[in-house]
Regions:
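Catalytic cores and adjacent binding grooves of peptidoglycan-active enzymes
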Residues: 7-9, 13-82
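Active-site-adjacent substructure of cysteine-protease-like catalytic cores
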Residues: 1-6
Length: 82
């Protein structure tokens, strides 16, 4: 896997869940499905990754792609290199 090769990383899965049309994971991430940080009710919403977030900027600047940009599903925790 890309994770085992050091070419992918998942950050704060609870605050940055994997979301598909038929559900999301982890199951206790319900309050973080709202991705607008001003509307999110999660206690740790400051740990959510979004395009203005420092983690997003650093990873993108270093050539990583983000699962939050995927079309079919969203993997907000996932950064990876092609």
């Amino acid at each position: 896997s890309k994770h085992a090769l050091g070419m992918a990383i998942d950050i704060n899965p609870l605050m940055n869940p994997y979301v598909r049309e038929d559900g999301y994971f982890p199951k206790n991430a319900t309050e973080y499905l709202e991705r607008d940080i001003t509307l999110c009710k999660g206690e740790h919403k400051d740990k959510m990754i979004h395009k203005k977030d420092m983690a997003y900027k650093i990873f993108k600047r270093n050539g990583f792609l983000w699962g939050g940009d995927w079309e079919d599903c969203k993997d907000y925790q996932h950064f990876y290199m092609k």
